From Swiss-Prot:
The keyword Glycoprotein applies. The record marks Y463 as: Critical for TLR4-TLR6 dimerization and signaling. Disulfide bonds join C243-C311, C272-C333, C313-C322. Glycans are attached at N79, N134, N205, N220, N235, N247, N321, N417. It comes from Mus musculus. It is a multi-pass membrane protein. This is Platelet glycoprotein 4. Multifunctional glycoprotein that acts as a receptor for a broad range of ligands. Ligands can be of proteinaceous nature like thrombospondin, fibronectin, collagen or amyloid-beta as well as of lipidic nature such as oxidized low-density lipoprotein (oxLDL), anionic phospholipids, long-chain fatty acids and bacterial diacylated lipopeptides. They are generally multivalent and can therefore engage multiple receptors simultaneously, the resulting formation of CD36 clusters initiates signal transduction and internalization of receptor-ligand complexes.
C-alpha cells in the first residue's frame, strides 16, 4: 500500500516535471514557429497576408484640410502689417482608395515595382462646408513671379501683366480651386507657353506617384518594404550630400519585429525628402498592442540644433544664415516655386518664422505626426500625417502688388491631417490571426510551465512527507 502511494507520488512528480520541461521547450520552439510564420506572411508576394493589404489598403484614409483665411489683405499689401489669419475647416476628402498599379516582381533582385494612383473624393458629411466655399488667400502666381523671375526687366513686364489682369497680392478662391487648380488670369496673359493652371496640389487627380521599387523581403526579411529606388533613381536630386538619399519604407509598413530603440525611417514624396520617427509610447489600439512612433522636433531643427540637418538648409537669407528652424524649403522639387513645408501652425518653428503671422495656435497633440506600428509584423495600423503648406512672398520693387512690403513673409496657406485607422473588422481578424494566436501560445506555455512546477513541487513534498512518516 505504501509502495503504491509512493509510486503514485513519484509518478505525479515526474508528470509535473515533464509538463514543466515541455512548457519550457515550447517557449523557444513556439517563438521560432511564430517568427517563421511572420517572416512568411510579411513577404510582398502573391498569396501572403501582407501582399493583399499592400496592393490596396483595407483602411479608409481621410485627408482633412484647414484653410488659413486672411482677415486683413489690404492692410498687409499697403502697410506690410502682420498677416491676420483664421483657420477654417475641416474640409475632408477620402484618399488612397485606389489599388497600386503596374505591379511587377523582379525575382533576380527580390524587388517589386509599382505606381500609386492619386485620387480625392470630397466627403460633405465630414466637412464644415462645400467645395464652393470661398477664402481670401495669397495669390500664388503673383507671389511666385519675382522669386522665379529675378531679372528686373522681366519683372517690369510681369508687373504690366499683373496690372492688366487686375491681380493683386491676395485673391479670393474656392476650396476646389485652391486645392486642385484654377486658370490664373495673370499667367494667361504671359505671351509664351507656360502652364496657366495654379493650385496647391495641382495636378493631383488622375496622376500617379512613382515608380516605386521596393524590396519584397523574400531573400532578406529585414529589408521588406524598404524603397530600393524612386522614379528609377536612388537619390532625389533635390538636396546636397546624404540629405538627398531615399531611406526606409513608405511608412505603410516596416520590417517585422520592431524594437522601441529602432528609428523608423521613411520617404514622403509630399515633402520631397526622407524623414524619421522615434518611439514615443505604447498604446492599445482596438485590443492590439502597438508602438506609437512620433516625428521628433529635431527632424525640422536648424543645423545649430541638429548638425545632421545642415544639407537641408539650401538658402541663407530667409533662414537667417541657417539659424531659423521649423520650416523646409522644397522649392527645388516644386519647379522653383517658393514652397515651404512645416508642421501645422508652425509647431516647433523658430519665433522669427511665426512672428509676422497672427492667429496661429500650435498644439502638440493636434499638430504632431505619428505612426502606430504593430511591433511583431511591422504593419502601421494607425497614423496621422500633419503638414502645413506655406508660400514665401518677398518685397519686389518692380511689381506694384508687392512693392510696399518691408519684409519677407512665409505665408501659411493650409494645413492637412491625413489619417487612417484599422477598421473594427480588420482589427478582429488581425487579433484572431496574429496577436490572438501569439497570446494563446504564451498562455499555454506559461500554463504548462506553471502547472508542471506546481505538480512537481507538490508531489515531491508529499512523497518526502510520506516517506518520513513511514520511516517513523
Amino acid at each position: 500500500m505504501g509502495c503504491d502511494r509512493n509510486c503514485g507520488l513519484i509518478a505525479g512528480a515526474v508528470i509535473g516535471a515533464v509538463l514543466a520541461v515541455f512548457g519550457g521547450i515550447l517557449m523557444p520552439v513556439g517563438d521560432m514557429l511564430i517568427e517563421k510564420t511572420i517572416k512568411r506572411e510579411v513577404v510582398l508576394e502573391e498569396g501572403t497576408t501582407a501582399f493583399k493589404n499592400w496592393v490596396k489598403t483595407g483602411t479608409t484614409v481621410y485627408r482633412q484640410f484647414w484653410i488659413f483665411d486672411v482677415q486683413n489683405p489690404d492692410d498687409v499689401a499697403k502697410n506690410s502689417s502682420k498677416i491676420k489669419v483664421k483657420q477654417r475647416g475641416p474640409y475632408t476628402y477620402r484618399v488612397r482608395y485606389l489599388a497600386k498599379e503596374n505591379i511587377t516582381q523582379d525575382p533576380e533582385d527580390h524587388t517589386v515595382s509599382f505606381v500609386q494612383p492619386n485620387g480625392a473624393i470630397f466627403e460633405p458629411s465630414l466637412s464644415v462646408g462645400t467645395e464652393d466655399d470661398n477664402f481670401t488667400v495669397l495669390n500664388l502666381a503673383v507671389a511666385a513671379a519675382p522669386h522665379i523671375y529675378q531679372n528686373s526687366f522681366v519683372q517690369v513686364v510681369l508687373n504690366s501683366l499683373i496690372k492688366k489682369s487686375k491681380s493683386s497680392m491676395f485673391q479670393t478662391r474656392s476650396l476646389k480651386e485652391l486645392l486642385w487648380g484654377y486658370k490664373d488670369p495673370f499667367l494667361s496673359l504671359v505671351p509664351y507657353p507656360i502652364s496657366t493652371t495654379v493650385g496647391v496640389f495641382y495636378p493631383y487627380n488622375d496622376t500617379v506617384d512613382g515608380v516605386y521599387k521596393v524590396f519584397n523581403g523574400k531573400d532578406n526579411i529585414s529589408k521588406v518594404a524598404i524603397i530600393e529606388s524612386y522614379k528609377g533613381k536612388r537619390n532625389l536630386s533635390y538636396w546636397p550630400s546624404y540629405c538627398d538619399m531615399i531611406n526606409g519604407t513608405d511608412a505603410a509598413s516596416f520590417p517585422p519585429f520592431v524594437e522601441k530603440s529602432r528609428t523608423l525611417r521613411f520617404f514622403s514624396s509630399d515633402i520631397c525628402r526622407s524623414i524619421y520617427a522615434v518611439f514615443g509610447s505604447e498604446i492599445d489600439l482596438k485590443g492590439i498592442p502597438v508602438y506609437r512612433f512620433v516625428l521628433p522636433a529635431n527632424a525640422f531643427a536648424s543645423p545649430l540644433q541638429n548638425p545632421d540637418n545642415h544639407c537641408f538648409c539650401t538658402e541663407k537669407v530667409i533662414s537667417n544664415n541657417c539659424t531659423s528652424y521649423g520650416v523646409l524649403d522644397i522649392g527645388k522639387c516644386k519647379e522653383g516655386k517658393p514652397v515651404y513645408i512645416s508642421l501645422p501652425h508652425f509647431l516647433h518653428a523658430s519665433p522669427d518664422v511665426s512672428e509676422p503671422i497672427e492667429g496661429l495656435h500650435p498644439n502638440e497633440d493636434e499638430h504632431r505626426t505619428y505612426l502606430d506600428v504593430e511591433p511583431i509584423t511591422g504593419f502601421t495600423l494607425q497614423f496621422a500625417k500633419r503638414l502645413q503648406v506655406n508660400i514665401l512672398v518677398k518685397p519686389a520693387r518692380k511689381i506694384e502688388a508687392l512693392k510696399n512690403l518691408k519684409r519677407p513673409y512665409i505665408v501659411p496657406i493650409l494645413w492637412l491631417n491625413e489619417t487612417g485607422t484599422i477598421g473594427d473588422e480588420k482589427a478582429e481578424m488581425f487579433k484572431t490571426q496574429v496577436t490572438g494566436k501569439i497570446k494563446l501560445l504564451g498562455m499555454v506555455e506559461m500554463a504548462l510551465l506553471g502547472i508542471g512546477v506546481v505538480m512537481f513541487v507538490a508531489f515531491m513534498i508529499s512523497y518526502c512527507a510520506c516517506k518520513s512518516k513511514n520511516g517513523k
